[in-house]
Swiss-Prot record:
Organism: Sus scrofa (Pig)
Binding-site residues for NADP(+), renumbered to this chain: 141, 255, 394
Subcellular location field: Cytoplasm
Site annotation Important for activity: residues: 255
Protein name (Swiss-Prot/TrEMBL): NADP-dependent malic enzyme
The protein's required cofactors: Mg(2+); Mn(2+)
Biological classification of the source: Eukaryota, Metazoa, Chordata, Craniata, Vertebrata
EC number, as in UniProt: 1.1.1.40
Catalytic reaction list: (S)-malate + NADP(+) = pyruvate + CO2 + NADPH; oxaloacetate + H(+) = pyruvate + CO2
MF terms in GO: magnesium ion binding; malate dehydrogenase (decarboxylating) (NADP+) activity; malic enzyme activity; manganese ion binding; NAD binding; oxaloacetate decarboxylase activity
Family, per entry: Belongs to the malic enzymes family.
Predominant location category: cytoplasm
Amino acid sequence: GYGLTRIPHLNKDLAFTLEERQQLNIHGLLPPCFISQDIQVLRVIKNFERLNSDFDRYLLLMDLQDRNEKLFYKVLMSDIEKFMPIVYTPTVGLACQQYSLAFRKPRGLFISIHDRGHVASVLNAWPEDVIKAVVVTDGERILGLGDLGCNGMGIPVGKLALYTACGGVNPQECLPVILDVGTENEELLKDPLYIGLRQRRVRGPEYDDFLDEFMEAVSSKYGMNCLIQFEDFANINAFRLLKKYQNQYCTFNDDIQGTASVAVAGILAALRITKNKLSDQTILFQGAGEAALGIAHLIVMAMEKEGVPKEKAIKKIWLVDSKGLIVKGRAALTNEKEEFAHEHEEMKNLEAIVQDIKPTALIGVAAIGGAFSEQILKDMAAFNERPIIFALSNPTSKAECTAERGYTLTQGRAIFASGSPFDPVTLPSGQTLYPGQGNNSYVFPGVALAVVACGLRHITDKIFLTTAEVIAQQVSDKHLEEGRLYPPLNTIRDVSLKIAEKIVRDAYQEKTATIYPEPSNKEAFVRSQMYSTDYDQILPDGYSWPEEAQKIQTKLD
């Protein structure tokens, strides 16, 4: 009846047939009109296009997700290049900043530090019994925007929307979670509309015990092969939690490993332009947080695969943090940074560092808008015939340089990629270049699909190198000529399928899969797991019997 039209994964709106409306007792609750899903998509797109701001477009799509889930994903998949920047970066950053103001309907699970000792009970409130993927954040480092506390829930929600749209993971089996331990954001603490706990962040043993309880509760309820993706945790927690849980649970950190994989994929594609090996590069990072260190470690692993000893590979990588170049003997270096500290004088100015190190590749992941100055870009072009310049920080306002500056200040010779989308750039020569967007969405949907499909218990760093290689293989020579270092976003579902197929194939070879019998056709097996946006048959299967068999007996023998 009426309640059915309020259940997002069952609601079809005006696509309910007359028979469905009559038998489900919703006839009369809908206008006397029957339209296809394709026409429904057209209506959404027309409404989308008449809105003036991306934030309003975001709200439109979120309302649709809360009303008609199949249609929401049909719309996203109809033009993923158009809709991804709305449901995820960069618009999701603005949405998180406005999350309390725009709050309409809760989506996901809100677990607070005051629920310690009862996390399992809170999980029981979730209506779905089968969950295969969880995305969790504590809201402390949302994109490049800092501590947004409970407002960070927009990130797990948006991330899981892309699990489905880009990877085909069933949305009914996905769970977005915010762990609310407080916030250090003064504006939020004073905001009467803020939806989270009004207290300073809990840290130390109490925080760790809370995380332990959460991980144990999720794995106990949903199984050891339930994927738990960590998202937007602060640097002080991200590395140690990954290290702590990686071999204990089915988990990964997208900010560290997902970013690393997509960045390395871009570098591997760039090497087809520079015509040399990864181990021939000198790589300088602006930033030394989760993203930079994750990329650096995966580059080392890729160089080792080329046959370069680990110690030699590490020497090819330099990092710059807020205090300057990371060198041996510098005070207060973390263990993670210490690994990439080299013998060199201390330097603070990025322009001077670039002139001194003369990198072949410059990678920005520090969320400092405009950090790649005109001088730096011109120097990169002076040192290299084809300089590799990746401005990977999100959102767009935090990008180290725009695509236009990246190309024009290097006479169009830069091999450029960014974290947020940029428009194509037409050079004075008339050539149009399409900057590659190093979006983690090339990575995590395929990895998640593979984990769900074959029941992986642990997600190793090797999986992310494999993923990078598969992504790079999907880039054609024509794409490279156009400046693209990544496959077109509109092929992302096919890319995810290829990633998942390769990971699943390796998992069965290495005996790490847990779902048996082993499928003979891995591609068909993975494809069969992918979510369909077609409306489900709601009515019971109806069929006829022979007329003779249906005769009603009226006389007693």
